[in-house]
Amino acid sequence: MDFLIVLKALMMGLVEGFTEFLPISSTGHLIVFGNLIGFHSNHKVFEIAIQLGAVLAVVFEYRQRFSNVLHGLGKDRKANRFVLNLAIAFIPAAVMGLLFGKQIKEYLFNPLSVAVMLVLGGFFILWVEKRQSRAEPKIADVDALRPIDALMIGVAQVFALVPGTSRSGSTIMGGMLWGIERKTATEFSFFLAVPMMVAATAYDVLKHYRFFTLHDVGLILIGFIAAFVSGLVAVKALLRFVSKKNYIPFAYYRIVFGIAIIILWLSGWISWE
């Protein structure tokens, strides 16, 4: 394998892992960064691999929690509610994605839409943080979430179908807006990422498996490992961060990044293939 291609695959995996769980839109970062470094994968298999690497970072970080849930399923009330809440939160975006995913990609997957959603999302985060600073959150533990709370987070996740919104951003801010404490909303967003991303990965594999070749294995493994490691770092770092601080820095970053996308696009530095 060419060293430069390997390096680019490594960098793309790192970008996916670092941005997937932050409220800053991993999709926007992958497209912009891929254009800037000249990395153009021939098919979806590489993207599927790095997404899977990122989601497995959450499974690894919370392996004890998931193990307890699996062993307690059907017997333990907390485990049953946890799975029920994930299922409820999963459904809205899954249904809307199946119904309108093709149209969303056709009409909204462009620099202007992504940039606008990044900027609007940044201002939305500022508003939610200001609102929560004035009110005491009602729910401060994932195990205290009710099915109605999970449903509201699931409804918020529907907005993440629009490129540039950020899945983690929509679920975390949706949870906080509903009265869930910042760290609790963040953790539930991590947990919800597992069924959402596994389902999306399985769907993409069924659609694109025929494009897989043994020639791609090396790059796929490099991207997968990079996404797993960087995803693990991002999850740990974000949990520490939100234990003491708020999401306002990410809001400003989104606004600046959204404006930067427009500038890069208009100047011809990035394309949107």
Curated annotation (Swiss-Prot):
- According to the UniProt record, what class of enzyme is this? hydrolase
PANTHER family, per database record: UNDECAPRENYL-DIPHOSPHATASE
**Extra notes?**
Bacitracin is thought to be involved in the inhibition of peptidoglycan synthesis by sequestering undecaprenyl diphosphate, thereby reducing the pool of lipid carrier available.
**Molecular function in Gene Ontology:** undecaprenyl-diphosphatase activity
- A Pfam family assignment: BacA
Which protein family is it in? Belongs to the UppP family.
User: Which gene holds the coding sequence for this protein?
Assistant: uppP
Q: What does this protein do?
A: Catalyzes the dephosphorylation of undecaprenyl diphosphate (UPP). Confers resistance to bacitracin.
Upper lineage: Bacteria, Pseudomonadati, Pseudomonadota, Betaproteobacteria, Neisseriales
Question: What is this protein's record name?
Answer: Undecaprenyl-diphosphatase
Q: What is its EC number?
A: 3.6.1.27
Which reaction is the catalytic activity of this chain? Answer: di-trans,octa-cis-undecaprenyl diphosphate + H2O = di-trans,octa-cis-undecaprenyl phosphate + phosphate + H(+)
Q: Name one GO cellular component term.
A: plasma membrane
Where in this chain does the entry annotate a coiled-coil region?
Answer: none
GO biological process per UniProt: cell wall organization; peptidoglycan biosynthetic process; peptidoglycan metabolic process; regulation of cell shape; response to antibiotic
